[in-house]
Amino acid sequence: MTELVGRTRARCVETLSLDSTGTRNALSAALVAELSAALAECGKDPDVRAVVLTHTGTTFCAGADLRDPPDPDALVALLRQLIELPRPVVARVTGHVRAGGLGLLAACDLAAASATASFAFTEVRIGVAPAVISLPLLPRTDPRALARYYLTGERFDPAEAVRLGLLTVTADDVDEALAPVLDGLRRSAPQALAETKRLLTARVLETFDRDAASLTALSARLFSTDQAREGMTAFLERRDAAWVV
């Protein structure tokens, strides 16, 4: 079986690379399961100080795989796992991020992107809503500023992603920008990192506890509607949906 998540390690930093370029690293049931297993191993390994989540190809993550979507509960569990992992997780993005991929980005503790990256909440254009991914997104961003992109599905650039709170930093050379961040994590005590992360994620986890069930139900309901079926069919057929005027 082809591995969908690559793994390398350098000086106690484990790099997990989404590696399903044929689907633009879309969140399939298999990819979600493999990433979850890799994260679980990182969380148990005392030699892992931090995790970098990155990708191969030109897309960090295209969102849910419409041909092999993950169970909504599995996606919620993956996002929560990123947040609860007792190691800082740093997103490294050098390509496009769409829909559910932005949920992964928001679940990471820090996020850096190259100047060529682009972002879009495309759910509304296929007849659904960014429901489950709102669990990590809304507590960590400015909802008023986010409203434009949630409601329109427009693309936006890394500078705007920084302004919204989706990114920590953007730079022409993302690895150069991340070098001092990773150096700082390597210099920090593991126990202190874990407890400091707990402080930073407490409000996000409160949102999961309160809203996960209702947002999962909303996602399931919307994906079963006629508009969602039309939207997904139009997307796969590369045409405008019937409601476009």
Model-flagged regions — what are they?
Residues 1-56, 179:
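Conserved CoA-thioester-binding segment of acyl-CoA-metabolizing enzymes
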Residues 112-117, 167-213, 226, 242-245:
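C-terminal long alpha-helix characteristic of the crotonase
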Residues 149-150, 161, 199, 203, ...:
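Helix-loop "lid/cap" segments that line or gate small-molecule binding pockets
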